[in-house]
């Protein structure tokens, strides 16, 4: 009986440590995707100049690998996929899905256009304006126990085959790599959400004249 009580006391004593170890191992486990948190801008945009638009995302990165050598050593199971997480009020499940990079950009820009009351249409008509997003940089690095993320893209408003106006957006961030915690997604999300919302879509569409 005494041995049983001693065994129970030892379990109670070391249980928190065991739980912490299991949590740490679970947190350290590499995933096949990077979590990307995105929130639509709180400010409602002005009434758009158009109600329909085409949307195109192209990959113009010089380096198509989103991870540096050192970052890939940490994220060994990453398969070029991104879990898009959105948590607007009133929704139970914030996870939109897991996408490749191009689809990730398409999804969030569709959300922004939808928020503005603009319908994204699949059309070959030159009369319908097109928002073309060219991803130029998307790079996650890990150096000296810090995550570094850089991102850039160029948005162009195209109509009748002509580029009417364009806006270049870029930025970067860094975050300490805390042992036992995967901060890669947090580092990416901080820059990604900010830069997506930096694009002034209303201003781009404002370049369309009534005649166009």
Identify the function of each model-found stretch.
Residues 57-62, 134-139, 170-172:
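Generic short beta-strand segments
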Residues 30-40, 115-165, 174-176:
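Surface-exposed short loop/turn segments
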Residues 28-102, 204-212:
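A structural "domain/chain start" motif
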